[in-house]
Structures are given as structure tokens and as C-alpha cells.
Design a protein with these regions (language model features):
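Short, polar/acidic, helix-capping and beta-turn segments at strand->helix junctions
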Residues: 1-114
Length: 114
């Protein structure tokens, strides 16, 4: 049920916006924790669909309703996906509009086979 899109230029892959929907059912959990878990599942599926791995990701942008508290919610999944603190991608967290139905969204840039 993977539906993420993106763009490819040479070895660069730029994802489309990724939400916290469950990649299998397309349902959106109501809570931040569930959406964070699903966002990281979607990131992995998207980069693998492009022929890469999470090791190819060089930057992730997150938009969150409350970036100050949201960053803490990201940290556990971030450390699981990128366990080596010396080789993690750049990460930027920005404010998401208060009227957005999602707790967070993200996009990423990867360089695959470059």
C-alpha cells in the first residue's frame, strides 16, 4: 500500500511529503506517538522503493504542530533508524499549521549510489 512519491535526479532522491498514516492500512492514528512510528516506517519504505537504504538519507525535514515537544517524540525512532550519532543525516524541525489534521509530516533527501 506504499504510495509515497518523489523525484529522482541522477543519484539524488527527494521524497514527497510523508504523513503519519499506517503504510499498510492508510489509517491515521490520532496520537503523536503512532504518527511518529508510521512516519519512520514510511521513510524506510520510500527510500527502499527508490533503490536505497536509510544509510543513503542525508537530510530529513519534519513539520510538527508543536516542535518544542515534538522533537522529544522523534528522538527514539530517530536513534533506532540512525543509531550512529556520528553518521546521522541533518534534521530540521519546523512548525506545522495548527489546523493541519496531522501531528507531523516530513520529507527527506537521499543520495543513492552516488
Amino acid at each position: 500500500m506504499h504510495r509515497q512519491s518523489g523525484i529522482r535526479t541522477n543519484s539524488s532522491r527527494l521524497s514527497g511529503i510523508i504523513s503519519g498514516r499506517d503504510p499498510q492500512t492508510s489509517t491515521m492514528p490520532p496520537d503523536l506517538g503512532g504518527q511518529v512510528t508510521n512516519v519512520f516506517k514510511q521513510i524506510k519504505l520510500c527510500v527502499e522503493a527508490a533503490g536505497g537504504s536509510v544509510d543513503d538519507i542525508i537530510k530529513v525535514n519534519f513539520w510538527m504542530k508543536d516542535p518544542a515537544t515534538g522533537r522529544a517524540a522523534l528522538n527514539g525512532e530517530w536513534a533506532k533508524m540512525f543509531p550512529d550519532p556520528d553518521s546521522r543525516p541533518a534534521r530540521h524541525t519546523l512548525a506545522l499549521g495548527a489546523n493541519n489534521p496531522n501531528h507531523l509530516t516530513c520529507d527527506f533527501t537521499a543520495v543513492i549510489g552516488g
